[in-house]
Amino acid sequence: MKVLNNLLYTGDHEWIRVEDNKAYIGISDCAQRMLSDIVFVELPEVDDEIAKGETFATIESVKAASDSYMPVSGTIVEINEELEDNPAALNEDPYGSWIIAVEMSDKSELEELIKPEVYEKICEELDKEA
């Protein structure tokens, strides 16, 4: 299981990579392993405004459907359209296959996210339970 040090994470297994006021958001390696074979991703629309904690995508696998929640509030400026034709990209490269990019409305919300070293321990515990 891989946890990247240049990202922040949520307890719901989303990751966020910040570039100035723009943030790319996806699901972690830990999440894609729990979901297993991803077959469909329901994406939001560009220009949608979504608050922190609200659902921004639904990811369906052969095992289950899972909502993904916004780690920060913002306006969607880009969606990863590749996922419409190739949802399995989230399994193959969860950190390269971002889901959405947002213009953040409150950067202070980043302070509430989980640091990589803490998130790694969370995932290790989940692996032990599996």
From Swiss-Prot:
Keyword entries, A-Z: Lipoyl
Modified residues (N6-lipoyllysine): K63
UniProt GO BP: glycine decarboxylation via glycine cleavage system
Pfam family for this entry, one: GCV_H
Free-text comment on the cofactor: Binds 1 lipoyl cofactor covalently.
GO cellular component: cytosol; glycine cleavage complex
Residue ranges annotated for the Lipoyl-binding domain, each copy included: 22-103
Subunit structure comment from the entry: The glycine cleavage system is composed of four proteins: P, T, L and H.
HAMAP family: GcvH (MF_00272)
Descriptive protein name: Glycine cleavage system H protein
Lineage, opening ranks: Bacteria, Bacillati, Bacillota, Clostridia, Eubacteriales
